[in-house]
Amino acid sequence: MSILLKGAKIVDNKSNYNFIQKDILINDGVITDIADNINSKASKVLNLENLHVSRGWMDTSVSFGEPGFEERETILNGLYTSAASGFTSILLNPNCFPLIDNHSSVEFLKRKSKDQTSQIYPIANLTINSSGEELTSLYDMKTAGAVAFGDYKKVINDSSMLKIGRAHV
């Protein structure tokens, strides 16, 4: 099946076509041509006002059931849904059980998304057991792939805890 996108604005800062309007020809799910005016007998032609095309989007607040609540949603199902919705990157909240509060839990999440269309960027817990009392191993989790820290919807009353946490990252 072939699809022709007419006059699509390309949003991709790694491309020579960034913020430029072009026609895009897609054959069997693969972009085969990008040009000013493609005249092709495509199976489907989309000529929509304000059409934009990009590599993918990032969702900065995602919650899956796994680990711990797989009956709600598994990581693989969540990643499939994210990809089908156009998200190639997701920040996964630390609201699972066990909590994302150590190196191996961050590695587990990164490993689960390794060969998937959507990639997980874990938000790890700032404090052990989300208690707001003792910091987790922030440096270790950062080296494992955590991109942010927080105790998901729990207030951290000790501002020095936040300052120390920030200094460790």
Language model features: what each stretch is:
Residues 1-40:
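N-terminal metal-binding scaffold of metallo-dependent hydrolase/deaminase domains
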Residues 5, 44-46, 58, 91, ...:
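Hydrophobic/aromatic beta-strand patches that form the interior of the parallel beta-sheet core
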Residues 8, 24, 29, 50, ...:
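Divalent metal-coordination and catalytic microenvironments
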Residues 11, 93, 152:
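Conserved residues at the C-terminal ends of beta-strands
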Residues 37-53:
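Active-site metal-binding motif and surrounding structural segment of the metallo-beta-lactamase
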Residues 49-113:
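Metal-associated gating/positioning segment near the N- to mid-region
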Residues 96-108, 113-168:
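Histidine/acidic-residue-rich, glycine-tolerant segments that coordinate divalent metal ions
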